[in-house]
C-alpha cells in the first residue's frame, strides 16, 4: 500500500470512528411525562428497555437513539405498577414485574423481546410486590419486596415457587447472580447487602448480611458488568442527602465483607443500572417527587438514563 493510499485510508477510518463515537448517545430522555421509571434492561447491541412505574408503559430506545419512546402500552401489557425489567436475548424474552397495589396482586410477565407481543404471566403465590429479576440456567429469580421472599420460575414450570424467605428482613430489592455462583440481593429499607449460598440441590442455603466499608443507603438495582463485576445503585448514598446524591457503585466481595467503590455520584434518586459494553446506563427515578411533601405536585421535569463509562 502506498503512503498516499495509507494516508487516505487512515483518514477515512478516523472519520468513521469519530462519526461512530459522536453518534453514541450519553443521555437518553424518556419521551413522556411523570414517568418515574424504576428499572431498565438492555441487549448487547445497545437497545434499552425502560419501565415507567407510574405510566404503566415499557419504553424502548434503539441503538443511537436519544429518546426512549413507548413500545408496549399500558393497555397492551395490561400493566399497573411496572417495576423490574430484564431483557434476555438468548430466549428472545423481556421479563417485567407488574403490580396491582389495590388488589395486592403481583405478576411476573413475559413478552417477546423483538415484537413486544405477550407471552406468559405468572402470579405471585399469596400476593406480594414483584420488584426485580435475575436469570440463571434458564430459571428466573424474582424479589418480593413486601414479604422478604425470592421466588423462582424453573424452566418449563407454569408457576412460581418460594426459593428464599426471610420475613424478618423484608424490602428485598436488587438481585443478581455473581461469578462466584452465589446470589446477591439487598434491602432498600434496612440497607443490607446479602449473599445467599446455594445448596447442592439448587435450593437456597445460608444467607449472610455482608459488612461494607461504606454505609449503604437505599441500595437498589444490582447487575453484573459485561466483565462480571457487581454494579449497584444507591438512591441517595446517605440519610438526609440532597436530591442529586444518588450513586453508581462497584461492589467487591471479600469473604463476609464488601468494598464499595463509588464509580459516579450526583444522580437524582437513581433506581436502576444496566450494562452495554463498557458503559453502565444509570436510570434516574426521581421518586422524591412522589415521597417528599415539599416536592409532591411539582414538576419533576424530564427523566433520563445516563451513560457512565466503567473503568
What are these regions (language model features)?
Residues 274-311:
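Blade-level signature of beta-propeller repeat domains, shared across WD40, Kelch, NHL, RCC1
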Residues 62-66, 112-117, 154-158, 197-202, ...:
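Short loop/turn segments that connect beta-strands within beta-propeller blades
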Residues 104-137, 143:
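Asp-box/WD-like beta-propeller blade repeats and closely related beta-sheet repeat scaffolds
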Residues 53, 99-101, 145-147, 155, ...:
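Short loop/turn segments immediately following the C-termini of beta-strands
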Residues 108-114, 246-253, 297-311:
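Beta-propeller blade signature
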Residues 56-59, 103-108, 148-151, 191-194, ...:
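Structural signal for beta-propeller blades
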Residues 24-30, 67-76, 117-123, 159-166, ...:
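A short beta-strand motif characteristic of beta-propeller blades
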Residues 31-48, 76-98, 124-141, 166-183, ...:
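Beta-rich, blade/repeat-based domains predominating
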Amino acid at each position: 500500500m502506498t503512503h498516499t493510499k495509507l494516508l487516505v485510508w487512515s483518514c477515512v477510518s478516523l472519520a468513521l470512528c469519530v462519526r461512530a463515537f459522536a453518534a453514541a448517545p450519553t443521555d437518553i430522555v424518556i419521551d413522556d411525562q411523570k414517568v418515574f421509571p424504576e428499572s431498565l434492561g438492555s441487549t448487547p447491541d445497545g437497545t434499552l428497555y425502560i419501565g415507567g412505574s407510574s405510566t404503566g408503559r415499557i419504553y424502548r430506545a434503539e441503538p443511537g437513539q436519544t429518546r426512549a419512546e413507548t413500545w408496549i402500552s399500558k393497555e397492551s401489557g395490561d400493566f399497573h405498577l411496572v417495576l423490574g425489567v430484564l431483557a434476555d436475548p438468548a430466549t428472545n424474552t423481556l421479563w417485567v414485574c407488574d403490580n396491582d397495589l389495590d388488589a395486592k396482586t403481583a405478576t411476573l410477565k413475559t413478552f417477546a423481546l423483538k415484537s413486544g407481543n405477550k407471552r406468559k404471566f405468572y402470579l405471585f403465590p399469596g400476593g406480594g410486590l414483584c420488584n426485580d429479576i435475575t436469570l440463571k440456567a434458564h430459571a428466573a429469580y424474582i424479589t418480593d419486596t413486601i414479604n422478604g421472599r425470592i421466588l423462582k420460575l424453573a424452566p418449563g414450570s407454569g408457576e412460581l415457587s418460594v426459593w428464599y424467605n426471610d420475613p424478618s428482613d423484608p424490602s428485598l430489592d436488587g438481585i443478581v447472580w455473581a461469578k462466584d455462583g452465589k446470589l446477591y440481593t439487598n434491602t432498600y429499607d434496612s440497607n443490607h447487602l446479602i449473599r445467599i449460598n446455594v445448596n447442592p440441590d439448587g435450593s437456597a442455603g445460608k444467607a449472610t448480611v455482608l459488612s461494607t466499608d461504606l454505609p449503604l443507603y437505599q441500595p437498589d438495582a444490582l447487575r453484573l458488568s459485561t466483565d462480571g463485576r457487581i454494579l449497584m445503585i444507591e438512591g441517595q448514598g446517605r440519610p438526609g442527602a440532597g436530591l442529586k446524591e444518588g450513586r453508581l457503585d462497584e461492589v467487591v466481595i471479600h469473604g463476609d465483607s464488601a468494598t464499595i467503590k463509588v464509580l459516579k455520584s450526583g444522580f437524582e434518586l437513581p433506581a436502576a443500572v444496566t450494562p452495554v459494553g463498557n458503559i453502565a446506563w444509570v436510570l434516574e427515578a426521581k421518586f422524591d417527587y412522589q415521597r417528599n411533601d415539599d416536592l409532591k405536585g411539582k414538576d419533576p421535569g424530564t427523566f433520563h438514563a445516563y451513560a457512565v463509562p466503567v473503568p
